[in-house]
Amino acid sequence: MSYSVLEALRNNPDHVRKVLAARRLDVSLVDRFIELDGRWRQLKREVDELRRSYNQLSREGARAPPDRRREIVEKARELAARLEKVEKEMEAVEREREELLWSFPNLIHDSVPVCPEGVDSVPVRHWGTIRVVKGAAAPEGVEYVVVEKPPVGHADMAEVVLGMADTLKAGEVAGSRFYYLFDDLVWLDFALAMYALDRLAQQGFRPVVPPYMLKFDVIRRVLDFDTFKDAIYKIEGEDLYLIATAEHGIAAYLHKRELVEEELPLLFVGWSPCFRKEAGAGNRDLKGIFRVHIFHKVEQFVFSLPEDSWKWHEEITKNTESLIRDLGLPYRVVNICAHDLGAPAAKKYDIEAWYPAQGMYRELASCSNVTDWQSYRLGIRVTRKGMRREFVHTLNCTGLATTRTITAILENFQREDGAVEIPKALRPYLEPIRAAPKEYIYPRRRG
């Protein structure tokens, strides 16, 4: 089976038009592709016919008497010249067609919502009781308790109350969206990573630390490079880009690999720093460590048989829900609207934690089924019974992004005296470390 987008363009172009419209993209791309693909097929037939004719003439020339051989050789020369010309035209059309095919986003699952302006997601489920400040509106259908006093925001908790982060000095020496993290928040960062790695490894995911940089020809195959080239960092003078997530390095691990059916699924849990320019963020979340240029993240990644990928999409989403739920953080799962999916994803869930000081849910994790969008570009196939070859499906899902999870803990677990209770699920990962906090993080003594 060939690439699903190519199959749809050839056999059901109206469906692709519908997908592009739902994604708010240019539907005329379909007509341009059909035109190029038709021209390529025509030239391919002509090339095949010319090759057959040339081979036949070559065989005739070998058997022909001397008086006919010169005539056959001349015809063969004419055919060879014609073949070379048509082959060059076919290759040029093929390059243009492939470039256009790469610009198409993934198809979308039937359950992906098509949303009106101003709506980016649809709630699916929620967990936990949220705290809502008196007088503020509560989300519909969510259990909540009213509190009189507004909680302290995560930025002020980290920098002012606890005194364990410094974005002002980091801004002086590195620029905005960088930070210094100190003392118990450092241990909390490591504990969150170990917690997620340990839990997921126990579920059969293989731990991996991927390369932190990838070559251009590789990174352009794992993400929508034209859209995100301004959001990732390039190493000056080198053919290398810093990864924005462990997903990129893990996906590239099987670049140009041929698998057999029995090898799948392959489950990985990666840890890496993530480097992001946050070019489109503007002035959003400038305070604190919620949206920063570098952070640590644990990532689930699955290479799956095509027929199993939707089952795995639900499974890895539930894995992350379990991690967040066991931390005691109220959250909800939302189904991302078609126009906000990003090109690779056929469907995406976001998992959002409740931030009581802000009075809203904010994204902690994202879980996508990319189907064969990445594997087509990376050349990752599986040979099925009967020697049928297919592109594998790839899926990714945040385990925990440590700095964001810290911000959610700071808002949800703060006490009146300024201390922050450490979620019970994290305490076993802090216990062996003598210098680490065990049950509470207390404000740093100053002076």
Swiss-Prot record:
Pathway in which this enzyme or protein is active: Aminoacyl-tRNA biosynthesis; selenocysteinyl-tRNA(Sec) biosynthesis; L-seryl-tRNA(Sec) from L-serine and tRNA(Sec): step 1/1
Database matches in InterPro entries: aa-tRNA-synt_IIb, aa-tRNA-synth_II, aa-tRNA-synth_II/BPL/LPL, Ser-tRNA-ligase_type_1, Ser-tRNA-synth_1_N, SerRS_1_N_sf, SerRS_core, tRNA-bd_arm
Catalytic activity: tRNA(Ser) + L-serine + ATP = L-seryl-tRNA(Ser) + AMP + diphosphate + H(+); tRNA(Sec) + L-serine + ATP = L-seryl-tRNA(Sec) + AMP + diphosphate + H(+)
A single cellular component GO annotation: cytoplasm
Gene3D superfamilies with a match to the protein in the record: Bira Bifunctional Protein, Domain 2, Serine-tRNA synthetase, tRNA binding domain
Binding site for ATP: 276-278, 292, 363-366
Coiled-coil residues: none
Short name of one Pfam family: Seryl_tRNA_N
Residues reported in the UniProt entry to bind L-serine: 245-247, 299, 398
Main enzyme class: ligase
Intracellular or extracellular location(s): Cytoplasm
A Gene Ontology biological process term: seryl-tRNA aminoacylation
Entry superkingdom: Archaea
HAMAP family named among the record's database cross-references: Ser_tRNA_synth_type1
Assembly, per entry: Homodimer. The tRNA molecule binds across the dimer.
Free-text comment on this protein's domains from its UniProt entry: Consists of two distinct domains, a catalytic core and a N-terminal extension that is involved in tRNA binding.
Function recorded in the entry: Catalyzes the attachment of serine to tRNA(Ser). Is also able to aminoacylate tRNA(Sec) with serine, to form the misacylated tRNA L-seryl-tRNA(Sec), which will be further converted into selenocysteinyl-tRNA(Sec).
Family: Belongs to the class-II aminoacyl-tRNA synthetase family. Type-1 seryl-tRNA synthetase subfamily.
Name of protein: Serine--tRNA ligase
Organism: Pyrobaculum neutrophilum (strain DSM 2338 / JCM 9278 / NBRC 100436 / V24Sta)
